[in-house]
């Protein structure tokens, strides 16, 4: 063997060992690295074997499925009737198109790839005989007792004339915990003295392997069927037909499965779910594409680990590892000092991030992160990236503890908690701390307040740092002469630029706005858009709000004691009142005419609107609901009363159907607004 070949073999051995190790950890509930890091290792090993076929051996990790049942498992081993294969993955559009080109079909099925735990069910003459984990694809753990307490798994299949129950039926499915149930499952676990689960997948995996049946019952496990194994007396012509039969027998199938004939539509489905992955009732990390026709599936066959007739498109990871370079703090608009991680840039959930929140110093200690650690970060959708914790095994002794500052990094004021048991430390210098002032300016310029388009983060910081504004009270008195000292709103020649002129124009127009937006812009702690709408809707002027007794304020729907007290406390401060006085003198809305109060036809109702409506904008439909006493919610749950479906409605419509909620079109919604009833 040449030196080059020897080096290649060493590289292969190293990669194969890492893949085997992390695969075993994953399938036996002790993952050390995010899925994306494992996928990258696996793909690297696959590529090495493709480039050097002589390296591949029959027991290579690229040739096997899952992982052997752990030696310390407390469950009995059980053989699957038919091998339980895995899926090959693609990670970008070109790889998907290549697979579609190699795998032509009259029809494909697209299904969400549930991020849960695989399960194998065997029914004989309709009776549930046993349930097992995937294991290594041939042998899994016998978890029949636990499966019997999952409500979605029927003990007895119900046959029909069209779909008689077969003599033997092996079902493949996925066990999971819904996104909605996960916080409550964690709350129960903490109440029972346990540590919270990191994510729903870990919760499902840990729950399914519990020996205590009562603990399993608490975990709200769900199951969706996504395939068949061995059968006797059942020969469907297509995957779609198989799903119809499963549903008829009482086995749950995915509400998100769709039939597609054009490969271009497959690509579009991948793109759609990339943008809507958080609309599903469960966590998902990809889209599975299957050839629908079962005769074609048989003709295509499978490799030693995966069928050739199916592929999983994996979305960009939401959990990855990177290096924690430093921990710094930022000062928010209410004085809250928040630590954040400065990291080596890393691609996560489709975007490159180099900073992530650490919430507060208690969280830094609880998570046990050290500067210099390799850390796991998570970014879900538009949520700010968060550090989940360190990879302790990768520490080399150079890491160091983070010391939380005692002084504000923006103004030097001594930090303190607002009250004794507060986990957040704050800078009490609210009046003149530049960090607080600039973030308050940015906030009041947002769409939820004055909507001042020309006043962004850089502009706000510039107005404060240059001394053009001492606080927000002078914002509406700004002139072109004031802006001549700006670095953002002037040209190189020292004249006010287009952005500066736009800022002054925006300020004039934003003076006449809704009263609730003015309340939001004041940055009163706890007073967000919902409370502001409620207060403005009841009192109609700033002065009436100031004069209202605390108890009366707290009785306002959507307000309560904490918000009411915070409101009262804010107006006890002289410089706060000076802001309101200067804005009023500049012509900012301080009261609004009391128009005809809309009939409270939606009082006590929670309504979700999904998709576009012809007669409403997004803001106006929300206003229509709130002004009639209803709650405009952004998520569908069992507590939702109505779901209004418009053009291009997303998966919220599907979830509403699954939960059996009342669904309305636009005409029904208008009837509900006008009469309190959606019936014709």
Curated annotation (Swiss-Prot):
Cofactor: Mg(2+); Mn(2+)
A single Gene Ontology CC term: cytosol
Key words, A-Z: DNA damage, DNA repair, DNA replication, Ligase, Magnesium, Manganese, Metal-binding, NAD, Zinc
GO terms classed as biological process: DNA repair; DNA replication
Pfam families: BRCT, DNA_ligase_aden, DNA_ligase_OB, DNA_ligase_ZBD, HHH_2
E.C. number(s) listed in UniProt: 6.5.1.2
Record domain BRCT: where: 597-680
Top-rank taxon, per record: Bacteria
Binding site for NAD(+): 35-39, 86-87, 111, 134, 174, 290, 314
Job description of the protein: DNA ligase that catalyzes the formation of phosphodiester linkages between 5'-phosphoryl and 3'-hydroxyl groups in double-stranded DNA using NAD as a coenzyme and as the energy source for the reaction. It is essential for DNA replication and repair of damaged DNA.
Full protein name: DNA ligase
């Amino acid at each position: 063997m040449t030196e080059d070949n020897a080096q290649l073999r060493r590289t292969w051995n190293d990669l194969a060992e890492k893949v085997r190790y992390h695969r075993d950890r994953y399938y036996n509930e002790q993952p050390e690295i995010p899925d994306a890091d494992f996928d990258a290792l696996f793909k690297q090993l696959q590529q090495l074997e493709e480039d050097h076929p002589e390296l591949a051996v029959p027991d290579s990790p690229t040739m096997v499925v899952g992982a052997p049942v752990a030696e310390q498992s407390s469950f009995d081993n059980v053989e699957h009737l038919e091998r339980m294969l895995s899926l090959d993955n693609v990670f970008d559009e070109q790889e998907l198109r290549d697979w579609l080109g190699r795998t032509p079909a009259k029809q494909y099925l697209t299904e969400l790839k549930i991020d849960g735990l695989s399960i194998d069910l065997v029914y004989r003459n309709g009776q549930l005989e046993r349930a097992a984990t995937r294991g290594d694809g041939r042998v899994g753990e016998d978890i029949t007792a636990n499966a019997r307490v999952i409500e979605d798994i029927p003990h007895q299949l119900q046959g029909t004339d069209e779909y008689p129950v077969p003599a033997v039926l092996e079902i493949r499915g996925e066990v999971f915990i819904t996104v909605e149930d996960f916080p409550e499952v964690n709350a129960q676990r903490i109440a029972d003295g346990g540590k919270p689960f990191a994510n729903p997948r870990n919760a499902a995996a840990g729950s399914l392997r519990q020996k205590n049946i009562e603990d399993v019952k608490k975990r709200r496990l769900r199951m969706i069927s996504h395939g068949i194994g061995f059968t006797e007396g059942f020969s469907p012509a297509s995957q779609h037909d198989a799903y119809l039969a499963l549903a008829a027998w009482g086995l749950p199938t995915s509400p998100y499965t769709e039939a597609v004939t054009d490969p271009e539509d497959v690509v579009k489905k991948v793109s759609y779910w990339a943008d809507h992955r958080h609309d599903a009732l469960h966590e998902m990390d990809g889209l599975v594409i299957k050839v629908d026709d079962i005769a074609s599936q048989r003709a295509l066959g499978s490799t030693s680990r995966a069928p050739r007739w199916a592929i999983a498109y994996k979305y960009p990871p939401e959990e990855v590892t990177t290096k924690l370079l430093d921990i710094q703090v930022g000062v928010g608009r209410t004085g809250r000092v928040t630590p954040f991680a400065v990291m080596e840039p890393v691609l996560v959930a489709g975007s490159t991030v180099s900073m992530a929140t650490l919430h507060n110093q208690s969280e830094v200690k609880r998570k046990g992160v050290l500067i210099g650690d390799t850390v796991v970060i998570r970014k879900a959708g538009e949520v700010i990236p968060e550090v989940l914790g360190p990879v302790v095994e990768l520490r080399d002794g150079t890491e160091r503890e983070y010391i939380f500052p005692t002084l504000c990094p923006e103004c030097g004021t001594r930090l303190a908690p607002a009250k004794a048991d507060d986990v957040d430390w704050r800078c009490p210098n609210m009046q003149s701390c530049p960090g607080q002032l600039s973030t308050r300016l940015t906030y009041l310029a947002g769409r939820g307040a004055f909507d001042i388009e020309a006043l962004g983060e850089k502009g706000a910081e510039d107005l404060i740092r240059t001394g053009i504004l001492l606080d927000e009270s002078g914002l509406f008195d700004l002139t072109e002469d004031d802006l001549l000292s700006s670095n953002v709103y002037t040209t190189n020649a020292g004249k006010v630029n287009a952005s500066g002129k736009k800022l002054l124009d925006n300020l004039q127009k934003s003076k006449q706005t809704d009263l609730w937006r003015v309340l939001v812009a004041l940055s009163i702690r706890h007073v967000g858009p919902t409370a502001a709408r409620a207060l403005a809707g009841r009192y109609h002027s700033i002065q009436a709000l100031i004069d209202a007794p605390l108890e009366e304020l707290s009785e306002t729907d959507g307000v309560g004691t904490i918000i009411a007290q915070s409101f009262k406390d804010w107006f006890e401060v002289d410089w706060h009142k000076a802001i309101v006085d200067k804005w009023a003198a500049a012509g900012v809305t301080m009261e609004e005419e009391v128009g005809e109060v809309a009939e409270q036809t939606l009082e006590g109702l929670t309504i979700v609107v999904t998709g576009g409506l012809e007669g409403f904008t997004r803001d106006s439909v929300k206003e229509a609901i709130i002004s009639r006493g209803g709650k405009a919610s952004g998520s569908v749950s069992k507590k939702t009363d109505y779901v209004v479906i418009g053009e291009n409605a997303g998966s919220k419509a599907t979830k509403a159907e699954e939960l059996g909620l009342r669904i309305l079109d636009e005409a029904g919604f208008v009837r509900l607004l006008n009469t309190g009833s959606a019936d014709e």
